[in-house]
Amino acid sequence: APGEKVTLLGSENIRGWQSVASDIWKVTLPNTFFGDFNPYAETIRGDWFTRVDREHHRGAVYLEGEWLWEAHSLDAVFRRPDPVIDQTDFKPSGEPIFKLHYLEIGEGNFVRMDDCTACEGPELFKREMRTTELVNIRDGHWAKFPQVDFAAGRDFLRVCANVLVGGYIDLHVDGLDGVAVACLPVGTTEKREITSTFEVPMAEQVTGVHDVYLRFCEAPVPPCPIQPPAEGRMWFAEVAEHDTTIWAQFGGVDPNADGIEINVRPTVFYPSQPGIDYITVRGFEMRNAATNWAPPTAEQPGLIGTQWSRGWIIENNVISHSACAGITLGKYGDAFDNATSYPAPGLSADYLNGTWAFNRTVERAAVNGWDRVGHHTVRNNHIMHCGQGGIVGSLGGVFSTITGNHIHHIHYQRLYKGYEQAGIKLHGSVDCTIAHNHIHHCALYGIWLDWLTQGTLLCGNLLHHHPDADILFEVNHGPFICANNICLSSTAIHNWSSGGAFVHNLIGGRVRRSSDGRETPVLKPHSVEVTGLHPIPNGDVRWYNNVFLSEVDMAPLNEHYLDSIADGNVHGHTAHHTEHEGHAVVMDSPPQWHLREASDGWFLDLEMSPAALASVPRKAVSSALLGRAVISVQAFAQPDGTPFRMDRDYFGNAHEPGNP
């Protein structure tokens, strides 16, 4: 009936729970209950997934609509102590264990490596982008950072690091033997060029200003380095030959009276084969799916997904609690799925090289109807609480429009690692429009556009509270346009691509730049026809009329392999090397800004001088000004190929015609 709420679930209500200890219950179900798919026997796996020394199952247990944490052992559910790790024979390798980019002691209280005044062992290294790292950190080394303000107390320690061997950071105040405030495990990772953040609550509260000492040690990584918070409730399952037993904590709730849901289905709405075109899914609540990891080299089932089809409309839905991906605009499956991590017998060893493998994925897509899929519309959905990504797609989302979605709390449990976690993660966003989305509290990134971002328009999005960056452009040749976005995380933009135009953005955090030797495809303009492969050099980037609220260094513009341009940008304070750009404005003092949530939405309070903003002329940005991307030789334009002109602001108000 009109106005009725319709909910589609991948879960079932389970009763028959038996109390086995204080606040611990169990239920045993015959395996026939699950049919051909038992999510408690199926582990999350796939290319570019790292399980972090334990298994992660596709099943889940829900109390009052929220999922419990999967424990790494039955002992953990009963809150028995973890087995002690035998370190009697452990000897440090002598290798560097990680390098540090910055510390964050409480929200927004950053300590930079430049602030280090004394150390034994590590070295300070200033990178091309003019940020300083602490490098060559080995077991037993230490570093001092003076006069750090703990104010009335800070609640967490967060570090940004490249992990090599892995180990621990002990934070002491007022001396190496002073009060131990935090011990942070900085785990291992398989991809050293990607920067990760690590966080731990403060073990002791201190106030006021103190000298901070970091002591570094190499150590074996414990079986489960990430645990749920103290209030987190856990579950654990064992699958035997004939039945499955689930133990869970319910926080004083009687599960037989309240009704407990458990995952039983791999998806909620997903076609059984490719090529099911022109489907509209509108106005549903869809949740609780036992999805698998959705990497770019495999079929990508989501809680709802299109599976290599054309012309879907997914709008006005509430989508939540997918074990991995919420909405997928993904590729078909074939014999080469996940071959980078799990090569089938007889496959070439070249598949172990991820770049080689994905280039072959693109080649196969071209002969499997890549030009006949995509053109989807994903709009006005509320997407939350998904383990991997809110919207995910490899190649199958070309020529699509993604607008007006609210995406938040993606990969927030962070029980595992990988390289596919974001609010929106697309490979091959060819001629896509991604606009007016609100994305926050997602790990690792808000929006991650990886490979084949060509003809893409990213416009009018609000992004904040992302640990690695609001937006990452990885190994693309462009052209792509990033315009009218508000990016407020500590790192706003990480540009690992050429051929980008950044226009009229409000940038609250840092800007990172990277280059790459990987050779990735270049396409014929406004098509999916591959014309060649090319590495990712520095440069061919345009920065017009942006407002930088934080420190940014423009010197690398003069050092790029390919020419880059900056003009008409406003720098909040402590900008560096603005002589490399035209018509730059540097404010006399840092702009004051605060993002706040209220009952009727999110609000940004920002104080800036209108006179300073109007003090220099700025150019109207258009296709004529932006020109063509060097490598793809494609004009900067709208996704449909029509000329681009930036004549309106984030709210849709017209720019001043003489000085935008």
Regions found by a protein language model. Give the residues of each.
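Residue-level signal for short segments within beta-strands and strand-turn junctions
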Residues: L63, V173-G175, K331, H409
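Extracytoplasmic
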Residues: K91, H101-P222
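Extracellular polysaccharide-degrading/modifying enzymes targeting complex plant/algal/animal polysaccharides
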Residues: A1-G106, V221-W308, I313, V318-H321, ...
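Residues within well-ordered beta-strands of beta-sheet-rich folds
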Residues: L9, F156-C160, E199-P201, D211-R215, ...
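Glycine- and acidic/polar-rich repeat regions and solenoidal domains
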Residues: F269, T291-Q307, A323-H376, H382-S622
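A short, polar/charged loop-to-alpha-helix boundary motif
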Residues: P660
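Surface-exposed loop and edge beta-strand positions of immunoglobulin-like domains
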Residues: P146-V148, A203, S272-P274, Q307, ...
